[in-house]
Amino acid sequence: MNVNAEIAGRPGAMTAPLLAVDNVTLQYKTEQHLVTATYRVGFEVHEGERFVLLGPSGCGKSTLLKAVAGFMQPVEGEIRLSGKPIRQPGSDRMMVFQEFDQLLPWKTVLGNVLFPQLVNKRMPKDQATEHARAMLAKVNLSRFENVFPHMLSGGMKQRVAIARALAMEPAVLLMDEPFAALDALTRRKMQEELLQLWEDTRFTVLFVTHSIPEAVLIGNRILLMSPHPGQVKGELNSDGSDPVDGTGAKLSDRIHEILFADRIEEQEAVPHG
């Protein structure tokens, strides 16, 4: 496969990366096949970045996220956090999924945010409770701390999941298409709330999406991936541009051009009678 990677200059690239994915090949087995999800993928995420993995289905975005989380090991290459190889899951990498059922249904909103802190014994219970309440305040859910998940809307459930993850103060927040199951209006609202939350706390996030507008809005770095197996197609700066207007629209067009260059070339190569 001909991969024409376009690499943009990274702000702060002279500093050591927080997360390094070094020529990583990932494979997994199905009943019929051994699937190569990614092939020699490499990128670096620096502290405080909003780094987006963007590509179509089959490019290994979610598989990469699982590997960063420590749920699977590369067959080639290495993934390092703060210079140390990732061998297993840890509380320094917290995940937010797109499914609404990621919350514990028998616990209240506060109980869900509090639960991983108590399991990890990060602080005394009373201190952890105040910390959990502070995170709920950041996602505007203080009034719902005693409510159970089945009483919440999809967007509210995702806010709880984000608060629960950030309450652990992870080195990297891993988000696997967290807003994909929401309606368009709620999705945009959640995107804006995530950006505001980032402005308040400057956490590091690795965000997976197949939506070009979402990538342009959320990311300040965007890694473009091609499928079957997943490979790096390019890497661009975004810095939260509006995907509709000005530089954001131009960036969206450039991303589309890079991601679908092979398809355009194939169409142009077909003789027309």
Q: Where are the model-predicted features located?
A:
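Conserved ABC transporter NBD signature motif
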Residues: G77-P89
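Conserved ABC ATPase "signature" region
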Residues: K125-F144, Q196
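A short, proline-enriched helix->beta-strand linker immediately N-terminal to the Walker B motif
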Residues: A167-A171
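Helix-to-loop junction immediately C-terminal to a conserved catalytic motif
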Residues: A69
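ABC-type ATPase nucleotide-binding domains, specifically the catalytic core motifs of the NBD
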Residues: K29-E31, Q73, L114-Q127, K138-V139
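Conserved ABC ATPase signature
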Residues: F148-L152, M156
